Amino acid sequence: EKIIFVWPEGILPGISQEKIVDYKWLFENHFNENHLLVLGINSKSVQRDTVKYFNSLSVYDHSLNLLSSYDKNNLVPFGEFLPLENILKNIGLKTLTNNYQSYSKGSERNIIKINKSNTSLKFLPLICYEIIYSGRIFNNSDFDFIINISEDGWFGQSIGPKQHFIH
């Protein structure tokens, strides 16, 4: 039986796409070829002397081979990026996201397509509050389902989780 495990963003603090392979032994011992793992994880891109960090949704097989990844397009101001960062860092406001610089925006949203071991699925990847932009994201309806990963625990007992669920 095929099983997709979906874990929220931030579930593995301090572990990025490049570091998750350090845990390959754990996944190989507890997951099998019928399992896929979808999780929120930080990723980075290095081009020349510029490092960009992304809030990403990544899909792995049971051996932690990266099958596909999506970088969040719509970032939360003051939560994932610091507006006017170049000005505000001069007064001490430099980092907001686990001591990284601001996250960078992903460049595009593509349907994630997985074709592996008799498994074929297509889903629309969303991270957290991107679901509220549904008018803009449903232009391409060539997917089987939506996976929206979110870590709403920081909302506490506020109205935030209820508002998020409505969308």
Language model regions located:
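Solvent-exposed soluble domains appended to multi-pass membrane proteins
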Residues: 4-167
